[in-house]
Amino acid sequence: LARKHSLSAVSAICILAFATQSGAAAPEPQAVIRHYADMALAKYEDALTTAKALDAAVDALIAAPSQETLDAARSAWKASRIPYQQSEVYRFGNPVVDAWEGRVNAWPLDEGLIDYVDPAYGTESDSNPYYVADVIANPSATINGETLDMSELTPDSIAGLQEAGEVEANVATGYHAIEFLLWGQDLNGTGPGAGNRPYTDYDPANCTHGNCDRRAAYLKAATDLLVADLEEMVANWQPGGAAESVVMGDPKVGLRAALTGMGSLSYGELAGERMKLGLILHDPEEEHDCFSDNTHASHLNDAVGIASAYTGRYTRVDGTQMTGPSISDLVAAKDPALDTEMRGKLDVTLAAMNAMAARAEGGEAYDQMIGEGNEAGNAAVQAAIDGLIDQTRSIERVVAAVDLGQVEIEGSDSLDNPDAVFE
């Protein structure tokens, strides 16, 4: 198996690795992938449902700005992250999902592209000519000879800003752009506290920081666009849809995609880019949900999604339990000891993630945990990283056990070549 280098709303979690009886007849691989695709559809439907609730909460905030309506919109954003993060396991190994993902979950972002920033942010960047474009304050701007017309802030116009100038940090759409517009910058470093944007940033009658009408228009455009993007992915997982067709044509291809998703999210993306990099640098800018201090929940729900892809179990936002033929069932029929090992590793990771989340819910946010000198916090994060790395080794063994040939799992310099992080 090859590795390549690359780059409070915590769902109620119980241990997902339920016992599988040894010696049970193996399910048909096609049935396993059918259930895997059905769970994908359910997760994206749930992400869409909660995004629509977020959109409604944003409407209420804009219609009647207050601390209450701002808090409600923030809570709706956190709730929307739960099913979406559990869907991230479908990204790697499925090019349809991977090509779409950057529109909804790209990070980190240079927030000066969108709105006002603290003076400490600076006024220029060698790598980003749009670093302080502030399109909310500037309906028109000329950058590198190109005129940027943002007189109308609509889903189409902000979609055109995404990765402006081919700079990945120009994130204009998706969950994290919305997060910034609801919380504002987190100026606390590795100290306590999240972003603290006032509700008056959306109140034309008592406007703070100017341009309250345009800020509201941008927020509304971003939430409308998120709903539209999720509707697209729901359609892609319907029978015959583009993403569903990737996995359903050949069961072996589907199983490779499923295990690539589990391994790449476990190792390169979550353990590496989202966790170990920030821990090495002790840098809150490397925190996934950096404005809201919701990172612990996002990481936990990623881990839940990985376990779900293996066990075939998913709890929908309405409480419905989905179960069906699973990769775990396939492995148990071939190698019961390996299935027990795999489920045990998933349990260890979930326990570490839950411990980290409990620490955050108890008052020490993730950006504080990764702070330099916080030995206990660093250790809590490292325990979750270790669990993810360890479960990836078992995923590699599962690939061999079900005879899938070569599967590429994303790597990360943070894990494979830490010195390169400082170059």
Role assignments for model-derived ranges:
Residues 1-10:
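Bacterial N-terminal signal peptides that target proteins for export
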Residues 19-22:
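N-terminal signal peptide c-region/cleavage motif recognized by signal peptidases
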Residues 25-423:
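Mature extracytoplasmic or organellar-lumen-exposed domains after removal of signal/transit peptides
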